[in-house]
Amino acid sequence: YGYSVSPFIYLPAGADSGSSDPVQVQPDVTFSKVSPKIPSYSPLASFASTTLFSELPGNPSIYEDRYTVRAGRWPTAWNEAVLVLRPNGTMDDFLEYTLGLRDYAGLRSTVDKIASGESGTIEESHNTYTYDQLMSPTFKLVMPYQRYVWDGNLGVWTDKSDDQSYMNDLIANA
C-alpha cells in the first residue's frame, strides 16, 4: 500500500496511556518543544525525531525472509500493522509509550519540565510484556485533510488540530 501523504496516528483517549485525551503517536510531537535543546549525547536525543510507523515495502519478499513471525501473520490490508522487535525480543523504550504500555502523560510532564529549563529524567524500562499486552493497542488513523473544516463565513479552510474537542470527536469516530 502506498501513501502520498503521511497520516496522523493516535492512541485513543484512555488507552492505558495515562491521558484523558488521544495521544498523537505519528508523527510524534512529544519532543518538539525540546528537540533543539537536547544535546546529542543525551539519552533523550534518540527520542527527538522518532518515527515508529512506516510503510512496508510493496514486495513482501524483501522482508518476509528477514523476519520471523512469532505470532499472528503479516499484514494483508492497509489498516493492519506489524510489531517488529529487536532480535533479542526487546523494544525501544519509546515504543512502550506509543503502545500505551507506559504513562504518556508522565513522559509529557517530564519533557515539559526539560523544555522550561528544569531537570527531569525518564526512567529506562526493563519491563516484560505478554503477547496480549503487545497486541491490545488499537490506533486511530486521521488523514491530514480531516483536521480542516470549511468556514463559510470567511471562505477558508480552518485547521482544527488545536481544537481539542473537535479532535477528540474526530479520533473517537475514526
What are these language model-derived features?
Residues 1-174:
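Basic-flanked hydrophobic alpha-helices used for secretion and membrane insertion
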